[in-house]
């Protein structure tokens, strides 16, 4: 019983760092396996070999038939199943303790570098480092692997029990094996009680397997949801995504304020050709409103505009520019 108590204490530590389904699984493991096996299992199978009676006087025949009927005792088989199923959980516990100690050492190094931190605050940090560890990263991989192996062991032991014993305890077992000279009938004590106990343990194993499968689905959904949250901030194309996975609309782009805000550039209409522009530029030159830098900008704008409007308009506009220049200058000085 001391071994059971030690294992129970270890699994209690695992329960603090498990999911909700994992806690239910551990509860089922404690109540319906450890307690039932320790209290009722041994009492049901105590007379298993002593009350196994065969209708023969052949020496050694009864022992051989019992070995054929029960290659391993049901209670020992269930204890072995319990140990195999609990082993991945204990490995997860070891990994968790290792990570907690590692985090505790890192916190100690950080606290040693801080002189102003009080000793009470350090003890609070140390106590919280071993009790509050989130299941993520390598710990999540270890936890998921332990659940997978628990499911494999549960299914394997269920198949093994069906192959070795079946799920019903027959009251009569027919044996034909050396040194028995003929077929021997052997009688099992309390077959109905043992059948009920076998079915009960079968249901517990099925519930445990179902909980493991549900926990795998829960962990898969949790990892998938975590991946969506990580990919919500950016996408391969550089367009941000929202929480629902839809692309967010691009932000409107506003031109930065220009350094030459005091210069009013003339507007140009492409439909009016080059006459309108030449008249405006001549007026600005006469009145002295255009700066040298603006003239360069205007000439560059006029060159682009003339090219856009077409090369044939250049020749026809040259005479008009000269005549407009002469008339505008005369009218200004008169």
UniProtKB/Swiss-Prot annotation:
Segment forming the signal sequence: none
GO molecular function, one term: gap junction channel activity
Cytoplasmic compartment spans: 1-12, 99-153, 231-334
Pfam families xref list: Connexin
InterPro entries in the record: Connexin, Connexin_CCC, Connexin_CS, Connexin_N, Connexin_N_sf
This protein's UniProt keywords: Cell junction, Cell membrane, Gap junction, Membrane, Transmembrane, Transmembrane helix
Tissues/organs with expression: Resides primarily in the ovary, oocytes and early embryos.
Main location: membrane
Residues on Extracellular side: 36-75, 177-207
GO terms under cellular component: connexin complex
Disulfide-bonded cysteines: none
Record's subcellular location: Cell membrane; Cell junction, Gap junction
Annotated transmembrane regions: 13-35, 76-98, 154-176, 208-230
Gene Ontology annotations of biological process type: cell-cell signaling
Membrane topology value: Multi-pass membrane protein
Alphabetized PROSITE patterns for the sequence: CONNEXINS_1, CONNEXINS_2
Family: Belongs to the connexin family. Alpha-type (group II) subfamily.
Subunit structure: A connexon is composed of a hexamer of connexins.
Purpose: One gap junction consists of a cluster of closely packed pairs of transmembrane channels, the connexons, through which materials of low MW diffuse from one cell to a neighboring cell.
Database matches in PANTHER family: CONNEXIN, GAP JUNCTION ALPHA-2 PROTEIN
Protein name from the UniProt record: Gap junction alpha-2 protein
Lineage, highest ranks first: Eukaryota, Metazoa, Chordata, Craniata, Vertebrata
